[in-house]
Amino acid sequence: MLQLYDTYTRSVREFQPLHPPEVGLYTCGPTVYDYAHIGNLRTYIFEDILRRVLEFNGYKVKHVMNITDVGHLTSDADTGEDKMEKGSRRTGKSAWEIAEFYTQTFQEDMCHLNILDPTLWCRATDHIAEQIEFIQSIEAKGYTYRTSDGIYFDTSKLPDYGYLARLDIEGLQAGQRIDMGEKRSVTDFALWKFSSPDERRQMEWDSPWGRGFPGWHIECSAMSAKYLGPFFDIHCGGEDHISVHHPNEIAQTQACYGTRLANFWMHGYFLQLDSAKMAKSAGGFLRVQTLVDRGYDPLAYRFFCLSAHYRAKLNFNWESLDGAATALNRLRLAAYEWGAPGTLDEGYMDKFAGQINDDLNMPRAVALTWDLVKSELPSATQKATLLEFDRILGLRLADWKPTEQVVPDEIMALVQQRQQARKEKRWKDADALRDQITAAGYEVKDTPQGAQVRRRVKAEG
């Protein structure tokens, strides 16, 4: 039985698909004005684990992820400039060019981290007509008003607006310190923004209300409803979406269809760098390429993320990543040396299913993985069971092989001397020679075919 935490009800609930065995899953994708940082990617790793667990349980998942390539202003309060236009000025490229470039780099990052591609990518700019139609439906039901800079959603028309975030609307109104302009309430938000008459935007479209561009929130409501229906199984995102973006998605869909959009709302928590949230706006952030440049396999970062529950903040430091890289190499080497897989151990599989079905409890699942590695089971059974675990872990254990290396002549000479000492039963000499080999960074293993020597736990990327 799969149990998942639902942010909307603030409870762990049994997951039952609305239309079994199909599951509709929508995950908020990147705003492609810059590179994704590893904090962003922690959320996508959590969502990848969720999808793998759903499929592990026999469900057929239709996974939709959006690409925000227009409409996301530098402030979630509908102020500031479009991040795509800002990125265009920063790079000297067109907004369309940077959207394509950063979409590709994001997809490459996902590949490096072995995050499964969604069933469907959907770009906001490919769905302008759907967004306009959605806004028209909201307008027809009396939930909008017009200002000099756009069409806004009137949140006062929804008595339970902000329930997902448990917002204190009256308190927000009393304590607001920002210039709301013509907004009637601090929580009202833009559905369509008008282009400034004295500015030519790269991304703008004609609409029934005038030339402009869609607000940030409308794309997710319109595209998820198009591909998954107005009420589907699971909607995911980062914890930063709980306060603004997701309540606004829910409001739009309530106004249009009378639903809260998704049966489960799930959120991954932040990665912290020195106990502070990692964010592009802070001026410095770490990319997957940063890890590669420092000699790390990106899958070591994936393994690092599995050390904490997705609903717990995770503090990043290089020492912790070193530990994850070492542990991953140990796991890879064990799987490689076990040889061909045999039959699964049902006892371990039952325990593993219990951990992952307990709201994706990956720390316990990883602990069980090490228990399997240390067990006295036949190596073929260990191998088969570990590879089945890896359907969820996503570490590509079946594909890994030690890097082929040329062993220096002086090391081979020590190996040969040790072999001779063993043949003559000079065990102390043999042990001393092994210590010399180890100190030089190599390890020797005695097999029926003779001694095998290699550099100690060197993984290929």
Regions found by a protein language model. Give the residues of each.
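Alpha-helical recognition segments enriched in aromatics with Gly/Pro capping
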Residues: 1-33, 48, 101, 107-108, ...
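N-terminal, positively charged nucleic-acid-binding surface of large information/translation enzymes
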Residues: 9-12, 18-114, 449, 453
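Short secondary-structure capping/junction motifs at helix and strand boundaries
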Residues: 60, 97, 107, 111-123, ...
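The substrate-binding groove and active-site-proximal loops of carbohydrate-active enzymes
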Residues: 88-94, 119-125, 210, 238-239
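Structural preference for alpha-helix termini/caps and helix-kink/transition segments
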Residues: 277-280, 284-461
